[in-house]
Amino acid sequence: MSDLPPTDSNAPPYSVSELAFALKRTLEDRYGFVRLRGELSKVTHHSNGHVYLTIKDDKSAIDGVVWKGNVRGLGVRPEHGLEVIVTGKITTYPAGSRYQIVIDSMEAAGVGALLAQLERLKAKLAAEGLFAPERKRPLPSMPAVVGVITSPTGAVIRDILHRIRDRWPCQVLVWPCVVQGDAAAGQVSAAIRGFNAIQPGGPVPRPDVLIVARGGGSVEDLWAFNDEGLARTVAEGTIPLISAVGHETDTTLIDFVSDRRAPTPTAAAEMATPVLAELRALISDLDRRLNRCGARTIEERRTRLVSAARGLPRPNDLLALAQQRFDIASGRLDAALDRNTTVHAQSLLKVTARLTPEALGRQRAVKAERLADLSRRLDLAARRAPDRVAQHARLPALWDRLNAAGQRRLQRDADRLENLEKLRQSLNPERPLELGFALVRKGDGTLARSAADLVSGERVNLKFKSGDRDAVIDGEGGPAPAPTAPAPKPRPKPAAPPAGQGDLF
């Protein structure tokens, strides 16, 4: 018999969507929230912030998704190969007939998985250079403000405050936060960013150094300080930071990124602050050494000065010779002043003797005669001035005549030069060659001037413009008719000068 249902059944058919959503409701109502343990694979961090992954064991696998809003709240970062325990809600994806788990929380399945994840994260941050020694900032030698990020209760904060109070007088700012659990990494990161955001000179003093402290605990207890976001926040800060998380044997990710690592919170307080008593003792010792050094230097300079002064002459000896020269010069000066006064008095008497009325009258007469002579010469020059003006008025006309005469002379000379050049060219022996004639030279090199100079069979040389040719005379020649000389060209007469204007040449 056939197992197929009868075709005449009256049961209403489901649509594909109705069946898919019915299965979805059944699955969600039956299971709700579940906890799964398995290994992560196919982890994909989408650009929109969601994370898609697969949770598998040795026999089966189930798809999972972490929505963007839940990614930051996960206890661990989803990575391929990590064994985890997830909590979420089972649902279906009707468009693909698949079921999946929507993950709300995630935690590592064991210490080994946590340490493996930590090693991968350490390698990643080290490759980015976050652990490089050159990034480490030096701690201030004498901080005025120390910022402490830790739990407000417990022995850690008491040990830090007590140790700082005993060593160094400074202000301590405590930023309280939880140091264990899922919220610890976010609160510690917020505290570090808050301290770095304080501006110098504001109402709240900006710390010179930060201490992140927590007591000892298990790997799970200290896991918040292995958070990647916390490590990057420490690296981005500008205030030097000391990490004091756990005991000396405990190592967290923040220890590699911080500027200094302290084995205990008490040691962190000692790293951050100097000892006031030691500084005072050091300053006192330096002051004593400086005073002794100064006194010794002054004594050495005084001894050297005394030794050098022994070789110097006495001041009176230095001035004795100059004083003697001064006394001699002052004695000579008195006598010289007396002689100078006598000479000038005699000169004054001679000058006053010449200033008589007769001498002044003679000088006046001479000056008057010279003045009269100058007046006569001035009158004569005034009478001749019109003639000089007329002569100067004729100068432009004379210059024009001189210029015209020079132009005519230049033109005549140019015409003569042109005629001479034409004559030179006509007398040039090479000129007939340019007109197609040839020069006939006999065997001895003489020029044949007529046919009678040549005999039959004689070898001659014909010179043309383009070159020479040898030839032999054949036949008897007769006298050539005498050439008629060309009539000479009439010589142009020079143009007559304009009427009323003379020729300077």
Swiss-Prot record:
Superkingdom to which the source organism belongs: Bacteria
Record EC number: 3.1.11.6
Compartment annotation: Cytoplasm
Protein name from the UniProt record: Exodeoxyribonuclease 7 large subunit
One of the GO biological process terms: DNA catabolic process
Ranges annotated as biased composition (Pro residues): 480-497
Pfam families, per database record: Exonuc_VII_L, tRNA_anti_2
CDD domains assigned to the protein according to its UniProt record, in alphabetical order: ExoVII_LU_OBF
Region feature (Disordered): 466-505
Organism: Caulobacter vibrioides (strain NA1000 / CB15N)
Subunit and partners: Heterooligomer composed of large and small subunits.
Entry function: Bidirectionally degrades single-stranded DNA into large acid-insoluble oligonucleotides, which are then degraded further into small acid-soluble oligonucleotides.
Name of the gene this protein is made from: xseA
